Curated annotation (Swiss-Prot):
One Pfam family from the record: DDE_Tnp_1
Record-linked PANTHER family: H REPEAT-ASSOCIATED PREDICTED TRANSPOSASE, PROTEIN YBFL-RELATED
Any one Gene Ontology BP term: DNA transposition
Coiled coil: none
InterPro entries: ISAs1_transpos, Transposase_11, Transposase_11-like, YbfD_N
Molecular functions per Gene Ontology: DNA binding; transposase activity
Record family assignment: Belongs to the transposase 11 family.
Originating organism: Escherichia coli (strain K12)
Annotated protein name in UniProt: Putative protein YbfL
Gene, per the UniProt record: ybfL
Length: 378
């Protein structure tokens, strides 16, 4: 995870300001912003305050001859950066410094930045789709859409930027689309898609193929696991089968389709022993040659994007409460949060959660320096 390479990529982002008016370099402003967000900054004022407090420290890493820009300058400059160029730099950085093996599951999922809407300019909240390496807990790419419904068109754009050869790509039911399946196959990856009512004929075929009797006593490859936590007990049954002859026509519609998969969960509250457990059935299709156990692992890994990314963004970084919305700033700040999460996740020396790492970085320059050194910047 080389931060030095990130700064090399960032240095090619065009600065559209008039050169003779530039007092603070774009690369320095971005460096300041990234360091500040690593240390818990949530606003432009926080970034300015961090810079004023750590100016001597920052001078070791960048050009701050003219001191720290005021928060209005930081906001104006960052909000004018091209999101496309920024995302290109981010993805190229991750491609340079992060290698993932063929067993990785890449979870693609979207998240709405709730307070990024701007009533005065009649702009709705933006929706950011992230590609998350579940093996390494790292964001490897992101793209913005204006609405969740636009995920269908945005996911192929995100895939265009990624190297997915040999990887399994997982999405929720929104991403279960024939065009997306074909694209993943063309790029050398495999898909594992959740199936719901948006694919009516496919969903009905699952219901007919896997009646309740089959779920209670599966004839196909199956794998069960149980878990107790928070006063609840959950038993999960996973079933995988080849596409049967009577459903072979689906293999012509869905490029590379090999497996039909079912996940059944029985959830009960331990204190309420007499209560019937709640049963949930979920259907999936996959082009990967999965066993029931590998299927169980893959769908469990998919939820890492919620637990290890979206939860951190909301609860630790307060993303949903962030009202930064000027120009392209909401989208850019989202990407900078992803950079901060990746860098802090890469730190294996201080074994603590993200919140403690951010606080320690804010209070301890030596720790912040070690985090940066661990990311190739010293």
């Amino acid at each position: 995870m080389e931060l030095k390479k990130l700064m090399e990529h960032i240095s090619i982002i065009p600065d559209y300001r008039q050169a003779w008016k530039v007092e603070h370099k774009l690369s320095g402003i971005l460096l300041l912003t990234i360091f500040a967000v690593i240390s818990g900054a949530e606003s432009w004022e926080d970034i300015e305050d961090f810079g004023e407090t750590h100016l001597d420290f920052l001078k070791q890493y960048g050009d701050f001859e003219n001191g720290i820009p005021v928060h209005d300058t930081i906001a104006r400059v960052v909000s004018c950066i091209s999101p496309a160029k920024f995302h290109e730099c981010f993805i190229n950085w991750m491609r340079d410094c992060h290698s993932s093996n063929d067993k990785d599951v890449i979870a693609i999922d979207g998240k709405t930045l709730r307070h990024s809407y701007d009533k005065s300019r009649r702009r709705g909240a933006i929706h950011v789709i992230s590609a998350f390496s579940t093996m390494h807990s790292l964001v490897i790419g992101q793209i913005k859409t204006d609405k969740k419904s636009n995920e269908i068109t945005a996911i192929p754009e995100l895939l265009n930027m990624l190297d997915i050869k040999g990887k399994i790509i997982t999405t929720d039911a929104m991403g279960c689309q024939k065009d997306i399946a074909e694209k993943i196959q063309k790029q050398g990856g495999d898909y594992l898609f959740a199936v719901k009512g948006n694919q009516g004929r496919l969903n009905k075929a699952f219901e007919e193929k896997f009646p309740l009797k089959e779920l209670n006593n599966p004839e196909h490859d199956s794998y069960a696991m149980s878990e107790k936590s928070h006063g609840r007990e959950e038993i999960r049954l996973h079933i995988v089968c080849d596409v049967p002859d009577e459903l072979i026509d689906f293999t012509f519609e869905w490029k590379g389709l090999k497996k039909l998969c079912v996940a059944v969960s029985f959830r009960s509250i331990i204190a309420e022993q007499k209560k019937e457990p709640e049963m949930t059935v979920r259907y999936y299709i996959s082009s990967a040659d999965l066993t029931a156990e590998k299927f169980a692992t893959a769908i469990r890994n998919h939820w890492h994007v919620e637990n290890k990314l979206h939860w951190r963004l909301d609860v630790v970084m307060n993303e949903d409460d962030c009202k930064i919305r000027r120009g392209n700033a909401a989208e850019l700040f989202s990407g900078i949060r992803h950079i901060a999460i990746n860098i802090l996740t890469n730190d294996k020396v201080f074994k603590a959660g993200l919140r403690r790492k951010m606080r320690k970085a804010a209070m301890d320059r030596n720790y912040l320096a070690s985090v940066l050194a661990g990311s190739g910047l010293s």
